[in-house]
UniProtKB/Swiss-Prot annotation:
Residues 23-37 have a biased composition (Low complexity). The gene is rpsI. One of its GO terms (biological process) is translation. Residues 1-38 are annotated as: Disordered. The keyword rRNA-binding does not apply. GO terms for molecular function: RNA binding; structural constituent of ribosome. Pfam families: Ribosomal_S9. The lineage of its organism: Bacteria, Bacillati, Actinomycetota, Actinomycetes, Micrococcales. This is Small ribosomal subunit protein uS9. It comes from the Bacteria. InterPro entries: Ribosomal_Su5_D2-typ_SF (IPR020568), Ribosomal_uS9 (IPR000754), Ribosomal_uS9_bac/plastid (IPR023035), Ribosomal_uS9_CS (IPR020574), Ribsml_uS5_D2-typ_fold_subgr (IPR014721). Keywords: Ribonucleoprotein, Ribosomal protein. Residues 9-22 have a biased composition (Polar residues).
Length: 168
């Protein structure tokens, strides 16, 4: 059994050497990029979604999120909303780098979460535009979601719902 394990290990080592020898990258370009220093500049921005408006300040800190004076998990108990809001930090590898202080008015939980995400992304973009903007733009975090509720029309029950039509 030990013989088989040794032969497998030697075969794996040979294949790794072959793969490394065929690489087109130079050792300098293949090396991981140096970690970016966290900027100690505060950022502020406004985000809107549906009827919700979020005003955000980002301050260098430990990653605490305060929404309307309450803890993040208390204000947004839904894990999906929590994930949606923290996505800009995850994409930029800045989790735990900034404290978020947010004031949100109007709308429901989903609209407020979307507004907060847009505001955080805009604030991160403001802090370090050269490094953050391409990543945030590619992920779609800087795009304002323009979908809003359609207005109710006269003569209809809702925006498009009409009463049942009778031919005779």
């Amino acid at each position: 059994m030990a013989k088989i394990a040794d032969s497998i290990d030697s075969a794996q080592a040979d294949s790794v050497e072959n793969v490394e020898s065929y690489s087109t990258e130079t050792p300098e370009s293949a090396a991981p990029a140096a970690p970016r220093p966290v900027l100690s500049v505060p950022g502020a921005a406004v985000g809107r979604r549906k009827e919700a408006i979020a005003r955000v300040r980002l301050v260098p800190g430990a990653g605490a999120v305060t929404v309307n004076g309450r803890a993040f998990a208390d204000y947004f108990p839904n894990k999906l909303h929590q994930q949606l809001i923290t996505d800009p930090f995850k994409v930029l590898d800045l989790v735990g780098s900034y404290d978020v202080i947010a004031r949100i008015t109007g709308g429901g939980p989903s609209g407020q979460a979307g507004a907060l995400r847009l505001a955080i992304a805009r604030a991160l973009n403001e802090i370090d535009r050269e490094n953050n903007r391409p990543t945030l733009k590619k992920a779609g975090f800087l795009t304002r979601d323009a979908r809003v509720t359609e207005r109710k029309k006269a003569g209809l029950k809702k925006a498009r719902k009409a009463s049942q039509f009778s031919k005779r």
